[in-house]
């Protein structure tokens, strides 16, 4: 039976409907499928009965059908609102789906996006990430790194968080405004509507990213608030979407290492700046970041560099899209 991607999105909101079921259904999705409630019920009913057998959901058919109708109607309303806000969606079976994201079996089953989705495949992508509280030296180094990447036409990928993420996006946006080179992609752990973007202080930056030829990307429908688990997944996708990963600065724990773990799993090269402050007399915060850099190098095989020129030399042998 041909299935519409809208049906899969609606089914994903039903408690107890598993990823493996949805993953199988994605392959059967077709743009030619008619979007209607009858087709949705025919598609999801077999899984509904399995849920009851597992003790998930009610054995009352009337209650079960009300749940399906609610999920279907609510999803279609949200998708209509998405279109009004120029937020689009695709399934992982689409030819437009970013090819790098398919590198792991746990890739998002569908994506919501605002902006230019093509840059994920037509440009080299560099994940520039790090702590929410970078030092002045780290921010200075990061701006130089991002200017370099933008100059050579990289798409700078980050997560719109405060600190290193925000600096990566802002530097890319400013460079694009001044030169027309480079761009940036923000992967979010929430819906792409203005009311859901986290942190809300960066909602305006999100609009600037789109206006400058960039992209906002999420696996969550509008109206979805950020949650800790979503942030962990977001960290992984940043690396998975990229050709290289650059953790500007980090402590010994945090989301940066989720990204580095995924990079190591996929043999994605990673590079970390060795900052001058790491040679300074000990200070608790600097010592923590020094240890974070050491962990990235020793455990995750990050290659350290002191200048952009060194990074350039490291990238010359390969790392093409």
PLM regions: where:
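Glycine-biased, small-residue-rich flexible motifs in mid-sequence functional cores and linkers
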Residues: 1-5, 92-321
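Short, positively charged patches
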Residues: 1-140, 318-319
């Amino acid at each position: 039976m041909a299935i519409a991607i809208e049906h899969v999105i609606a089914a994903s909101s039903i408690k107890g409907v598993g990823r493996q079921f949805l993953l199988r259904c994605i392959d059967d999705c077709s743009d030619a499928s008619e979007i209607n409630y009858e087709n949705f019920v025919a598609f999801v009913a077999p899984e509904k009965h399995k849920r009851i057998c597992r003790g998930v959901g009610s054995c009352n058919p009337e209650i079960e059908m009300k749940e399906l109708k609610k999920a279907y109607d609510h999803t279609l309303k949200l998708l209509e609102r998405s279109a009004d806000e120029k937020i689009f969606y695709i399934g992982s079976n689409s030819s437009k789906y970013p090819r790098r994201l398919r590198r792991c079996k746990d890739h998002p089953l569908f994506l919501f996006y605002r902006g230019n989705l093509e840059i994920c495949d037509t440009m080299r992508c560099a994940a520039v990430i790090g702590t929410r509280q970078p030092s002045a030296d780290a921010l200075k180094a990061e701006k130089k790194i991002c200017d370099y990447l933008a100059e050579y036409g990289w798409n700078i990928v980050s997560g719109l968080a405060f600190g290193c993420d925000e600096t990566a996006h802002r530097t890319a946006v400013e460079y694009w405004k001044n030169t027309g080179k480079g761009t940036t992609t923000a992967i979010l752990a929430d819906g792409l509507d203005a009311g859901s973007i986290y942190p809300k202080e960066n909602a305006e930056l999100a609009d600037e990213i789109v206006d400058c030829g960039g992209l906002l990307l999420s696996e969550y429908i509008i109206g979805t608030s950020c949650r800790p688990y979503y942030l962990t997944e977001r960290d992984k996708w940043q690396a998975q979407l990229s050709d290289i990963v650059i953790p500007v600065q980090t402590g010994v724990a945090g989301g940066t290492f989720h990204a580095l773990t995924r990079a190591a799993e996929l043999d994605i090269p990673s590079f970390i700046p060795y900052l001058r402050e790491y040679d300074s007399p000990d200070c608790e915060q600097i010592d923590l970041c020094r240890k974070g850099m050491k962990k990235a190098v020793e455990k995750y095989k990050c290659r350290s560099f002191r200048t952009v020129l060194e990074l350039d030399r490291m990238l010359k042998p390969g790392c093409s899209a």
